[in-house]
Amino acid sequence: MSLRPSTRAELRKKIYKTGVDADEARRRREDNLVEIRKNKREDSLLKKRREGMMLQQQLPLGAGLDGPQTAAAVEKRLEGIPMMVQGVYSDDPQAQLEATTQFRKLLSIERSPPIDEVIKAGVIPRFVEFLGRHDHPQLQFEAAWALTNVASGTSDHTRVVIEQGAVPIFVKLLTSASDDVREQAVWALGNVAGDSPNCRNLVLNYGALEPLLAQLNENSKLSMLRNATWTLSNFCRGKPPTPFEQVKPALPILRQLIYLNDEEVLTDACWALSYLSDGPNDKIQAVIEAGVCPRLVELLGHQSPTVLIPALRTVGNIVTGDDSQTQFIIESGVLPHLYNLLTQNHKKSIKKEACWTISNITAGNKLQIEAVVGAGIILPLVHLLQNAEFDIKKEAAWAISNATSGGSHEQIQYLVTQGCIKPLCDLLICPDPRIVTVCLEGLENILKVGEADKEMGLNSGVNLYAQIIEESDGLDKVENLQSHDNNEIYEKAVKILERYWAEEEEEQILQDGGNDNSQQAFNFGNNPAAPVGGFKFA
């Protein structure tokens, strides 16, 4: 019962640059990449709710379908629409109920329900009228169910329900004396809010949140908890986001919901928290103060990916905040869970999300980088940087590069001992200019430490890390970047070469006979000092 996402949104809000502060190094989610995953995830849940739950799961009053819906049976039903319309518009309550129930069953068939045909029959205004029949809750329920399924279709279908004035009536039905009517109103409002941010705002502006939250209590049956949590997640989702003050009252209820053991409730409650935590630091702080972090971290060990993914997304959003907000998550015990996500057999999207989360922790202060080091995360991170699919490599590159930016001399030395140089060099030929820049910056930060060691007389007066870069074919790759289309990459490559390899180039020119033409740096004389294949600078 989850809804299609909004269009793919902004790029990373914070683009990492050498020497920037930690807030700039931290990255909000790059919606260009993740909205695709969201799209698949949410569309599949929408279909599952609309089709699967109708057919298989418990329904109010035990009202299910009357057996398999063959094409011939559906066609026969469609032929009966004129008679059904007569029943809906009759003055006999029993005829009204029977005809409305027939329409509801028609709208509940598993494959391609005939929503357009039902709308064309002109019965939607009558169904909305039936919502007000408090003397006949069974009729209210059947009309609400039919309208719910109309609203589950396209945006045009949802608009028909809205334009007939159903939304404020559904909001009133959230306080109905009938459990079944209340639950169907919850579902209907979830479908309307799920259509678009404008529809979501319309529902909220009719005052739906407070009576919806009232459905989420210890006396509610499981089907109500599931439906109401899903609807609540639709109230919180979408771009542009819901005005935060409007949905902030949901936080205490969400804190209670994430301690339940039902997978559906957990999934939708975690998605709601992921939407609420996606934004500026004041939103993140409100989520932290709601007391959800310890349980979210615990859910990173949940066996179901449908729960794990939104819990991880929320944790990842929280660590895009400031150092103190990141520290709160660290102290909640997140790092051992992130280690497990990197090293165990999880699917690609989870490993990618875990690397993204780590990259925002390594964008923090030295103590936070040290916590990542202490949790043993660097080695599996480097392994993914070297061997994983490109999408994971990109996030791992951010994580390592951020650590080189804010890390101490000793921490950067440790990164090198874990083998980070070669995979950073290998990514210099990747097609994503942002990642090339990130890797160049990481290598530059490493070279600075190697140079400092050299100036202190260590490593026989050699920049050991420059040597490792050469041995990893990194020097050739950096040299090739001098002809890169991206000006920032070109300038950074030139700067690195001039700072760390110009000395050797000058030596080569001198040994080549003093020819300083950089385009013709060849030795045309008989210089016995020149080995076959040119010089190797160690």
From Swiss-Prot:
One GO MF term: nuclear import signal receptor activity
PROSITE patterns: ARM_REPEAT (PS50176), IBB (PS51214)
GO CC annotation terms, alphabetical: cytoplasm; host cell; nuclear envelope
Main subcellular location: nucleus
SUPFAM superfamilies, sorted: ARM repeat
Keyword tRNA-binding in annotation: no
Keywords, sorted A to Z: Nucleus, Protein transport, Repeat, Transport
Protein's cellular compartments: Nucleus envelope
Any one Gene Ontology BP term: host response to induction by symbiont of tumor, nodule or growth in host
ARM repeat segments: 112-152, 155-194, 197-237, 239-278, 281-320, 323-363, 366-405, 409-448
Domain of life: Eukaryota
Domain IBB intervals: 1-58
Signal peptide: none
Subunit architecture: Forms a complex with importin subunit beta-1. Interacts with A.tumefaciens VirD2 and VirE2.
Main function: Binds to conventional NLS motifs and mediates nuclear protein import across the nuclear envelope. Acts as a cellular receptor for the nuclear import of the virD2 protein of Agrobacterium and is essential for Agrobacterium-mediated root transformation.
Family under the similarity heading: Belongs to the importin alpha family.
Name of this protein: Importin subunit alpha-4
